[in-house]
């Protein structure tokens, strides 16, 4: 037990040191004091746009410094409790200390990752699209496994999810789906997950039990809020309505409530059929279009735009971000960071935090 406690303490202290440097705690505290003084000014709202920007920065610094100080304080309390438990030889309290430190270690690691979020949309909700690659039923099944993996990942992070659009495969799985992920920093946590995912396994659809390779792609884009301006001209849009697909039965949609919007200049398409109201589906599809166009613009500002565009359109060997091998051995490996794990079951159940952290750290390092 003592060894486990020391290990958790070491991890937390390492996270705190990285956070101290990443946040530049002393400078951030001075800036927060300055912002608090500015926020108290009676002239604050003379310039509404600047006031909103100032208050967002103030709120962000308060949250970051508050979380950092809380982790420090909780670690101090746990160490004091451990010292008391050792002096009294109280095993029950020692077990509680270990449990508390384990939880604090997880919180510190998550906060450490979130400090790598630097994009203007990283705090926003996001949309996740999954598309099956070539290969029919096998790829359709893999796309449905990926959908579950990301739904579980979102659940682990405390996010809410909403399936906006889904097209089922003929025999099994899905051809495609769009998921709205709702929660603070959802886009920050998901943005590095865009690309092609390769699965190697013994196919449950092959009578001979052959090992098969399947591909599916994911694309992530942020939901646009009032802080980000995206202008779309009506003349650039084509809006189509159609009957929503479904399994039939009592609630089958018998009206043309599903909506598809095409942005003619870019060829970008969004569609929504999650609601029985055509008006609500149109509003959601327009929101998705704004998000896609924003993401396309952000991609144009990066040197890797060609690679990213290919990753979302070409489900092939050359544009993979991650491989999932279930046979003849078990291994999930990120091809960008080389991070890997043999816990394939955990990964497919949504345990993706380490993969995301490694990708964000690599991206942060490449910008220095």
From Swiss-Prot:
Gene3D superfamilies: 3.30.160.20, 3.30.70.1660, Release factor
Residues bearing the modification N5-methylglutamine: 250
GO molecular function, one term: translation release factor activity, codon specific
Subcellular location: Cytoplasm
Pfam families: PCRF, RF-1
InterPro entries (UniProt xref): PCRF (IPR005139), Pep_chain_release_fac_I (IPR000352), Pep_chain_release_fac_I_sf (IPR045853), PrfB (IPR004374)
Domain of life: Bacteria
GO CC annotation, single: cytoplasm
Keyword Nucleus appears in the UniProt entry: no
Keyword Magnesium: no
Main location: cytoplasm
The record's account of how the chain is modified after translation: Methylated by PrmC. Methylation increases the termination efficiency of RF2.
Assigned keywords, A-Z: Cytoplasm, Methylation, Protein biosynthesis
Homology family: Belongs to the prokaryotic/mitochondrial release factor family.
PANTHER family attached to this UniProt entry: CLASS I PEPTIDE CHAIN RELEASE FACTOR (PTHR43116:SF3), PEPTIDE CHAIN RELEASE FACTOR 2 (PTHR43116)
Function: Peptide chain release factor 2 directs the termination of translation in response to the peptide chain termination codons UGA and UAA.
Name the record gives this protein: Peptide chain release factor 2
Organism: Rickettsia bellii (strain RML369-C)
């Amino acid at each position: 037990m003592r060894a486990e406690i020391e290990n958790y303490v070491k991890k937390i202290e390492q996270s705190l040191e990285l956070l101290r440097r990443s946040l530049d705690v002393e400078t951030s505290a001075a800036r927060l004091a300055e912002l608090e003084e500015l926020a108290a000014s009676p002239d604050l709202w003379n310039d509404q746009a600047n006031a909103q920007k100032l208050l967002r920065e103030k709120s962000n610094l308060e949250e970051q410094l508050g979380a950092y100080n809380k982790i420090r304080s909780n670690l101090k309390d746990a160490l004091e409790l451990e010292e008391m438990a050792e002096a009294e030889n109280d095993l029950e309290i020692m077990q509680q200390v270990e449990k508390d430190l384990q939880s604090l270690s997880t919180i510190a690691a998550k906060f450490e990752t979130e400090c790598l979020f630097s994009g203007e949309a990283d705090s926003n909700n996001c949309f996740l699209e999954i598309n099956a690659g070539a290969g029919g039923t096998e790829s359709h099944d893999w796309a449905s496994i990926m959908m579950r993996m990301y739904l579980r990942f979102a659940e682990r992070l405390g996010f809410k999810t909403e399936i906006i659009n889904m097209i089922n495969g003929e025999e099994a799985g899905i051809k495609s789906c769009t998921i709205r992920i709702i929660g603070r920093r959802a886009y920050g946590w998901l943005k590095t997950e865009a690309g092609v995912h390769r699965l190697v396994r013994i196919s449950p659809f092959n009578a001979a039990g052959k090992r098969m390779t399947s591909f599916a792609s994911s694309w992530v884009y942020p939901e646009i809020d009032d802080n980000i301006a995206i202008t779309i001209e009506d003349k650039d849009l084509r809006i189509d309505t159609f009957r929503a697909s479904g399994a039939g039965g009592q609630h089958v949609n018998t009206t043309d409530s599903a909506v598809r919007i095409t942005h003619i200049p870019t060829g970008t398409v969004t569609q929504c059929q999650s609601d029985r109201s055509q008006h609500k589906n149109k509003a959601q599809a327009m929101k998705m279009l704004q998000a896609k166009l924003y993401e396309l613009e952000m991609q144009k500002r990066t040197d890797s735009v060609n690679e990213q565009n290919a990753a979302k359109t070409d489900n092939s060997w050359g544009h993979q971000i991650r491989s999932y091998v279930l046979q003849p051995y078990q291994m999930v490996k990120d091809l960008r960071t080389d991070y890997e794990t043999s816990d394939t079951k955990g990964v497919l159940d949504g345990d993706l935090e380490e993969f995301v952290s490694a990708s964000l750290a690599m991206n942060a390092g490449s910008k220095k």
